[in-house]
Amino acid sequence: MSEFSQTVPELVAWARKNDFSISLPVDRLSFLLAVATLNGERLDGEMSEGELVDAFRHVSDAFEQTSETIGVRANNAINDMVRQRLLNRFTSEQAEGNAIYRLTPLGIGITDYYIRQREFSTLRLSMQLSIVAGELKRAADAAEEGGDEFHWHRNVYAPLKYSVAEIFDSIDLTQRLMDEQQQQVKDDIAQLLNKDWRAAISSCELLLSETSGTLRELQDTLEAAGDKLQANLLRIQDATMIHDDLHFVDRLVFDLQSKLDRIISWGQQSIDLWIGYDRHVHKFIRTAIDMDKNRVFAQRLRQSVQTYFDEPWALTYANADRLLDMRDEEMVLRDEEVTGELPEDLEYEEFNEIREQLAAIIEEQLAVYKTRQVPLDLGLVVREYLSQYPRARHFDVARIVIDQAVRLGVAQADFTGLPAKWQPINDYGAKVQAHVIDKY
């Protein structure tokens, strides 16, 4: 998990002092990718200057650049990448002029982004989650066993810091790559619809379904392992509560819980956003069909029916059940006959008109908790209030009580990232999910 020990001014001064900069036009980036590809084929991971020049020649030919100055331009490109810390150059006195080059971590990171991280793999994600689950279980067992400071550093903190956290970051990177792929798919669909939307419908449907399936597969894999991961993190957290000198472990566990929550939450949110985009595309296609002036679809259907016996086809259709409105539409017309006439004093009195009065009463009653610094259990308080009102008013009263309660303070348990338990608040199945408010 990424942690910065320096402040922002220190990092800025450090970058300025070392003159860090990255400039990779498309030809230089292509050259770097070519170097990484050729480097991956070598067992020693080393390349000579002649091999780099050969790689540059391939890139130069692909960009249709002149070959007369290939040596000078290749030398400039190599020196520029060494200056930008994308390549490391090693020379020796015995072999002067015959340098050896190796990719730096920065160069590997950039090329990995463009080459090795482009495809989503459920198997890779499953293996990562399996490794994380094993590491967390061993760390939780070690935490419950207890021991000296060396034991906590070696068997709990180190696996969490250097294995679990890094895999979480890798999964987070996979999600961000999926975000980028979604945007690319959207651009592809937009281009297809702009060119020839009639011919592009099948292609759009394929792109939509493939992306939706990949997102769902990713989320299902995460959710299947999420509960076990959280359970082991909670075991470690419980074990550290009795020790005052393990703040570094507790802080790391909290960071991991937050990271896992963000990963799972964003996975579901990205699915919801994609579903909305899917509906938007289908709505556009339906609108285009409705506005089809040339009746292309009608002509195609007529032709398909006429040539059915020569070229048989199958028709698949969906027919959803109709939603029936069970309200009595004539109720409004005979409202007076059913309810009779209200007394003049009550004719205009509705629940929303006494809402402010009720809210003031509840606010005054709940203020006692803040004055006495007593924890406020929303489940018990709401249930007590609802018992005083008819069932028809339960929703409105519960909303008022909760609105007034959350203004008094917050629950420290909310900052743990763990969901609260559902508590029944009436005898009709209504429930509320909220931590005890203990900080005013």
UniProtKB/Swiss-Prot annotation:
One of its GO terms (cellular component) is nucleoid. Gene3D superfamilies: Chromosome partition protein MukF, middle domain (1.20.58.590), MukF, C-terminal domain (1.10.225.40), Winged helix-like DNA-binding domain superfamily/Winged helix DNA-binding domain (1.10.10.10). It is found in: Cytoplasm, Nucleoid. It comes from the Bacteria. The keyword Disulfide bond does not apply. GO terms for molecular function: calcium ion binding. GO terms for biological process: cell division; chromosome condensation; chromosome segregation; DNA replication. It holds the Pfam family MukF_C. Coiled coil: none annotated. Belongs to the MukF family. This is Chromosome partition protein MukF. The gene is mukF.
